[in-house]
């Protein structure tokens, strides 16, 4: 058998183009590769060069499960109540009695870091993970956690690098009107507003909340809005008129200013079968644009819990198991893009 020795620069270049899940399995091949996959410069290079994997994960029965591939490093010994995804990292809120703790996990590398809370608090809070877009710093060097208590009585920031909490004194008045469960886009977090007239954003660089207008004039009625992301490269907004059998999709791939997003209407689906969906509200959407298919996670507590895969030829439904300990606790679906991003400082 002939052994082929390639120049290390070429090996580095080849490996940087492989998906993160493949590299995660290769990290124990040799010590040099393992060290390379932990190198911040290689992590950044691989993140930008490799094709993004867009997986769907589900939070149900206090655990996170993969619906498309086996991520063995998802903790199965932690009761997870909330989860937020950013750059391949999962920020999880755990329940222990009436108290909660925070833990950041990279399912691809298996790294886990517990976050000590500033004070004891219960589970009535919203959480988000993001990073500052400072050109002098790498994103992995400036990850922060945002925590909003119920009623927005307290808003806190935790910096992973300094391992410290701070309280934000200036908070946007619309914060208390946001829907829990935001999405991460280019380091910032976005939520839909209760009023449905705008999107609420949090900029992790300036640590400020901002109100962002919708790309269309909102008209009340049988209208449902949902916010999601595509491979963390595009922000996705869905507007559905179930009474008319119509779904419109808007996409944003860049931020023009602090309060303006660059939206473009991607496509519209019209079909009679949409009227037959037993939908109270849409919780999450995922999209395969080339196939013009929308995967819809619906809130239908009175019937079976279903995922609806909607296309021009109708829809099909897939059932999933309810949380038997609390039938009102709906499974939470979210888009996940694996990465080698490390938890700094290493713990």
From Swiss-Prot:
Kelch repeats by residue range: 138-187, 306-347
Repeat keyword on record: yes
Matching Pfam families: F-box (PF00646), FBA_1 (PF07734)
Keywords carried by this UniProt record: Kelch repeat, Leucine-rich repeat, Repeat
Cross-referenced InterPro entries: F-box-assoc_dom_typ1, F-box-assoc_interact_dom, F-box-like_dom_sf, F-box_dom, Gal_Oxase/kelch_b-propeller, SCF_F-box_component
PROSITE patterns hit by this protein: FBOX
Domain F-box, chain residue ranges per copy: 1-50
Origin superkingdom: Eukaryota
LRR repeat locations: 59-82, 152-177, 196-220, 261-285
Keyword Cytoplasm set for record: no
UniProt-listed NCBIfam families: F_box_assoc_1
Protein name, entry field: F-box/LRR-repeat/kelch-repeat protein At2g27520
Organism: Arabidopsis thaliana (Mouse-ear cress)
């Amino acid at each position: 058998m002939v052994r082929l020795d390639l120049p290390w620069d070429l090996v580095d270049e080849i490996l940087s183009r492989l998906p993160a899940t493949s590299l995660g399995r290769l990290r124990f091949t040799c010590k040099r590769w393992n060290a390379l996959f932990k190198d911040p410069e290689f992590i950044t290079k691989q993140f930008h060069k490799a094709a993004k994997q867009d997986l769907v994960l589900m939070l149900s029965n206090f655990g996170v499960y993969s619906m498309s591939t086996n991520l063995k490093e998802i903790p199965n010994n932690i009761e997870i109540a909330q989860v937020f995804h950013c750059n391949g990292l999962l920020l999880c809120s755990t329940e222990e009695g009436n108290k909660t703790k925070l833990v950041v996990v990279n399912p691809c590398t298996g790294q886990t870091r517990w976050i000590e809370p500033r004070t004891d608090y219960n589970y009535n809070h919203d959480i988000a993970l993001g990073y500052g877009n400072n050109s002098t710093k790498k994103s992995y060097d400036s990850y922060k956690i945002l925590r909003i208590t119920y009623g927005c009585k307290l808003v806190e920031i935790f910096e992973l690098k300094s391992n410290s909490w701070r309280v934000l004194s200036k908070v946007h008045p619309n914060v208390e009107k946001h829907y829990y469960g935001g999405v991460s886009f280019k380091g910032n977090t976005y939520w839909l507003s209760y009023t449905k007239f705008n999107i609420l954003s949090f900029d992790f660089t300036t640590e400020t909340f901002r109100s962002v207008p919708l790309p269309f004039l909102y008209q009340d009625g049988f209208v449902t809005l949902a916010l999601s992301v595509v491979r963390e490269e595009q922000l996705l907004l869905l507007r559905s008129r179930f009474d008319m059998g119509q779904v419109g999709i808007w996409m944003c791939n860049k931020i023009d200013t602090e309060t303006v997003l660059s939206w473009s209407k991607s496509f519209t689906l019209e079909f009679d079968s949409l009227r037959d969906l037993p939908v109270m509200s849409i919780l999450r959407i995922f999209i395969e644009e080339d196939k013009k298919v929308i995967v819809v996670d619906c809130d239908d507590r009175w019937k079976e819990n279903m995922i609806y895969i909607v296309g021009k030829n109708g829809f099909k439904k897939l059932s999933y198991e309810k949380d038997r300990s609390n039938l009102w606790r709906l499974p939470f679906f979210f888009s996940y893009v694996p990465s080698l991003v490390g938890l700094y400082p290493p713990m």
